[in-house]
Amino acid sequence: LKMCDENTICIVPIEGVTWTGLNDDVEALDKALDEFNKKTGYDIPIHVDAASGGFILPFLDPHKKWDFRLKWVLSISTSGHKFGLVYPGLGWVVWKDKKYLPDEMSFSVNYLGANITQVGLNFSRPAAQILGQYYQFIRLGFQGYKAVQYNSMQITQYLHDEIGKMAPFVNYSDHVENPLFIWYMKPDYAKTAKWTLYDLQDKLKQGGWMVPAY
């Protein structure tokens, strides 16, 4: 908040941080931002980047407040091609109310006999991903997604615990919040190791497992 001023467009917490696998505390941020806005007279909103957590939290932690139940959360984005269970590339952004979507972000055109309004940087594109998401919503429903995500979390927890037992490695956190976790090589082990995480990445790739290393 110390970096916010009259030119700040929004604050962007992340649910499912790529570098940690954890979630930012959006509820605490919303509370602090409310006090900040009252004090300064600003109306700085929150956009939640829920690329990973957006398809996890509603099903596995529905009581956690990170969404439109919070005062200053006005928009949320998530990836359909991650835990939304759709092939790449599909992303979603939703607003709390139409009034929060600036007119400057959308454009309308009369196309094939009808007025079409959209928000996007490109025009002609396939609808296959959207149809795939619609199919998954209809086929799985809330309970289906809940079952899939629960299973994903169980597998993640197992891998997290087992990798944590391996001598070369240490987990970034002692718990998992998404089907995503980070581990790294112990500094003392790395000093004498004849291989790196990039070597491990290459070996896993040979077995068909795409695991990023940084």
Where are these regions (language model features)?
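Active-site phosphate-binding strand-loop segment of PLP-dependent enzymes
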Residues: 1-45
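Active-site pre-lysine segment of PLP-dependent enzymes
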Residues: 23-40, 53-75
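Generic recognition of short, well-ordered alpha-helical segments
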Residues: 24-27, 147, 195
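Generic non-transmembrane alpha-helical segments
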Residues: 32-35, 158, 162-166, 199-209
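Glycine-centered flexible beta-alpha turn that most often forms the glycine-rich phosphate-binding loop
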Residues: 49
